[in-house]
Amino acid sequence: MFTPPLARLIEQLQRLPGVGPKTAQRLALHILKRPEEEVNTLAKAIVEAKKQVGLCQVCFHLSAESTCEICRNPNRDNQTLCVVADSRDVIALEKTREYQGKYHVLGGVISPMDGIGPEQLNISPLVRRVSQHQIKEVILAISPSVEGETTTLYVGQLLKPFTKVTRIAFGLPMGGDLEYADEVTLARALEGRRELDYN
């Protein structure tokens, strides 16, 4: 149905997360319609990003330098550390503009079914970082999947001897109806409740 070069492009685009066959086909056809200069600019940007973006040596977040902007920022709170599964979580938390501490990216979650144990994650550097620096609080911000819960409990137990360990509350989304929420979400929402502050 497609010429071999177009079929290869569609196949490669399908490898991207969230891109199914129809979306890959639409993207490929869109790329072919664009001017050659624009397509070359896109291809060059992809290659440059792959070559130039690595991991911060301190927190393992994406960085074009040995240390990321967040770790280098002197205005960030050095005594609070937020532990996340991957860089997408850092980006999501940064968008809230609520958190002013530093991060530690694990690089995934413990998932025995996928062959991922604690040794494959950035857990040892995290324990070293917390034990060697004056970290007053570690916030575990890992999604509440089965693997995420396993990771949260494992990391929490390792860090407990060194500092205060908390986790983010999970609950209902804004505008969500209670009747449509699952039992686990409702239970977490109740567990994470806080006293109303009228000030």
From Swiss-Prot:
InterPro entries in the record: DNA_Rcmb_RecR (IPR000093), Hlx-hairpin-Hlx_DNA-bd_motif (IPR003583), Rcmb_RecR (IPR023627), Rcmb_RecR_Znf (IPR015967), TOPRIM_dom (IPR006171), TOPRIM_RecR (IPR034137)
The keyword Zinc is annotated on this UniProt entry: yes
A single GO molecular function term of this UniProt record: DNA binding
SMART domains, per database record: HhH1 (SM00278), TOPRIM (SM00493)
ZnF start-end (C4-type): 56-71
Alphabetical list of Pfam families matching this protein: RecR_C, RecR_HhH, RecR_ZnF, Toprim_4
UniProt entry keywords in alphabetical sequence: DNA damage, DNA recombination, DNA repair, Metal-binding, Zinc, Zinc-finger
GO biological process assignments: DNA recombination; DNA repair
Residue span, Toprim domain: 79-173
Family: Belongs to the RecR family.
Described function: May play a role in DNA repair. It seems to be involved in an RecBC-independent recombinational process of DNA repair. It may act with RecF and RecO.
Name the record gives this protein: Recombination protein RecR
Native source species: Gloeothece citriformis (strain PCC 7424) (Cyanothece sp. (strain PCC 7424))
